[in-house]
């Protein structure tokens, strides 16, 4: 593709590049990456990139401009930090000056697979591999759409500059990811990491959509042969991607979705999967998606053969691959589904006290959605490993731009309107806490999900848990009944009672932030009772 000297709208942003490459094809991107020396080709033709110092997002460097049109809506917190208009203007000018007279890549596309509610977007970058990342991850326009595309939101990625004055500005570091919601612009500096662009647009959608009555969600979604849509929520390591990939169901998307008056839609046009310890036997879909046009990040490979070692975390545990969604065979086209019939919250309970599966009322679903619980195992200074609870509102607090209760309220309204069933699944430990309990085996978990999705679970007799107040089934066809009652699965019943109480108290303590001063969200009655 020949370089252009101007693309509509760039001059208005203050950008005057020497050359512009606009929505390149994959073959053209490949040539640019090679020519620029940005990537290495793996043994099977997949491009590999080293993202530099940053191999993950920089959550403490994410800011929103404190301006009148949005400051009353934003959830100002340890996740969304304030920055002044003056600081934004100073750094914006720095970004524009840095990028002007350079060769730039411009990606124009969309976020949101529903044409009625999608957001047009633009990403300007100096690196061909970042253009590649955007081409993989966002919705790619047709040639006809590209001609008339007027981007509503723009990301200017000046990853090659740093904010040396961050201390005077009262900011966290030289890195910055700043959103100006009134001007509909995001500027990025100091980090090359691709996920900043992906989650940047998600943060914008998490602001914009709920204000229009559309629920934005950090979840995966699939659809059955009868057109029944299911949503899977869960923090990292709970099995969200693995469990929503099902040979009998078509994938709508693996990470970001919206729920509007027509149903569910994918916000993205691609997948961004973790590849540490990737095994072709357990995750064949992801393994087979890693081919030409995919982009591997920070993986270790043999310098001679260029064969990737997925078991190595020498650079980072957060090794990733981005690829367009059509690299997965069993997908829903377009990436949309009807209103969900089922919602499944996944948690890895390292305390081993939650039932493998429980049924939730709408109020309980809102409670657990706001709690966003999972538990990890962290080493203490004595070398003893014990679980630590993690609560992340809406199963994705890091990306929630509005107050979490806004999303929970919308969830409850939509569940009620469309008669949606919700379940809480423990994909973690049963029969004991870490060191004693065993992880729920994948075949049992998959069988439970099958019984949820085909409705057979509702034929079971349910028992209410004395602490967590959730209803769990006594029997499920094809699943060992001994594990369904979490207390019975423990040898030491007193230890179970003590641990269940301890986790229940953690839920209650965490939920105080939503109950206090909120008439709408005093859902403490629907959480644990000690």
From Swiss-Prot:
CDD domains: PEPCK_ATP (cd00484)
Broad EC category: lyase
Biological process, per Gene Ontology: gluconeogenesis
Catalytic reaction(s) noted: oxaloacetate + ATP = phosphoenolpyruvate + ADP + CO2
Binding site for substrate: 57, 193, 199, 320
SUPFAM superfamilies: PEP carboxykinase N-terminal domain, PEP carboxykinase-like
Superkingdom of source: Bacteria
Keywords assigned: ATP-binding, Cytoplasm, Decarboxylase, Gluconeogenesis, Lyase, Manganese, Metal-binding, Nucleotide-binding
GO CC aspect terms: cytosol
Residues that, per the record, bind Mn(2+): 199, 218, 255
Enzyme Commission number(s) from the entry: 4.1.1.49
InterPro entries according to UniProt: PEP_carboxykinase_ATP, PEP_carboxykinase_C, PEP_carboxykinase_N, PEPCK_ATP_CS
Binding site for ATP: 199, 218, 234-242, 283, 320, 445
Biological role: Involved in the gluconeogenesis. Catalyzes the conversion of oxaloacetate (OAA) to phosphoenolpyruvate (PEP) through direct phosphoryl transfer between the nucleoside triphosphate and OAA.
Name used for this protein in its record: Phosphoenolpyruvate carboxykinase (ATP)
């Amino acid at each position: 593709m020949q370089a252009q000297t101007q693309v509509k709208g760039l001059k208005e942003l203050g950008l005057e590049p020497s050359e512009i490459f606009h929505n390149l094809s994959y073959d053209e991107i490949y040539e640019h990456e090679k020519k620029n020396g940005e990537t290495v080709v793996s043994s099977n033709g997949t491009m590999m990139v080293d993202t530099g110092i940053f191999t993950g997002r920089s959550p403490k460097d994410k800011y929103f401009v404190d301006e009148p049109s949005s400051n009353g809506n934003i959830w100002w917190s340890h996740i969304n930090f304030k920055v002044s208009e003056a600081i934004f203007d100073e750094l914006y000018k720095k970004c524009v000056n840095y990028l002007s007279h350079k060769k730039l890549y411009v990606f124009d596309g969309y976020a949101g697979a529903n044409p009625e509610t999608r957001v047009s977007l633009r990403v300007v970058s100096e690196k061909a591999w970042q253009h590649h990342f955007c081409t993989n991850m966002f919705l790619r326009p047709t040639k006809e759409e590209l001609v008339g595309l007027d981007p509503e939101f723009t990301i200017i990625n000046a990853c090659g500059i740093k904010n040396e004055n961050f201390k005077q500005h009262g900011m966290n570091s030289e890195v910055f990811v700043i959103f100006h919601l009134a001007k509909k612009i995001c500027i990025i500096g100091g980090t090359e990491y691709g996920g900043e662009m992906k989650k940047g647009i998600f943060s914008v959608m998490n602001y914009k959509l709920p204000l229009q009555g559309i629920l934005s969600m950090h979840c995966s979604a699939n659809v059955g042969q009868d057109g029944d849509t299911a949503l899977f929520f869960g923090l990292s390591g709970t099995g969200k991607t693995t469990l929503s990939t099902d040979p009998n169901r078509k994938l709508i998307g693996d990470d970001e979705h919206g729920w509007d008056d027509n149903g569910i839609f994918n916000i993205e046009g691609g997948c961004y999967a973790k590849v540490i310890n990737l095994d072709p036997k357990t995750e064949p879909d992801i393994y087979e998606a890693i081919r030409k046009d995919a982009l591997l990040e920070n993986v270790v490979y043999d310098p001679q053969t260029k064969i990737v070692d997925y078991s190595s975390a020498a650079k980072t545990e957060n090794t990733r691959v981005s690829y367009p969604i059509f690299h997965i065979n069993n997908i829903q086209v377009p990436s949309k589904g009807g209103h969900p019939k089922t919602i499944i919250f996944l948690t890895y309970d390292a305390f081993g006290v939650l039932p493998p599966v429980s049924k939730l009322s709408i109020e309980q679903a809102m409670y657990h959605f706001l709690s966003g619980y999972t538990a990890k195992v962290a080493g203490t200074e004595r070398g003893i490993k014990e679980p630590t609870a993690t609560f992340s509102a809406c199963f994705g607090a890091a990306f929630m731009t509005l107050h979490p209760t806004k999303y929970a309220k919308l969830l409850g309204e939509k569940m009620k309107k469309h008669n949606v069933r919700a379940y809480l699944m423990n994909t973690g430990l049963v029969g004991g806490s870490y060191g004693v309990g065993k992880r729920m085996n994948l075949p049992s978990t998959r069988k439970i999900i099958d019984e949820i999705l085909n409705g057979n679970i509702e034929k079971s007799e349910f028992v209410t848990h004395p602490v967590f107040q959730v209803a769990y089934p006594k029997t499920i066809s094809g699943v060992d009944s001994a594990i369904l009652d979490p207390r019975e699965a423990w040898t030491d019943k007193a230890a179970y009672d003590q641990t269940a109480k301890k986790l229940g108290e953690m839920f209650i303590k965490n939920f105080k932030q939503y109950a206090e001063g909120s008439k709408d969200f005093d859902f403490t009655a629907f959480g644990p009772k000690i």
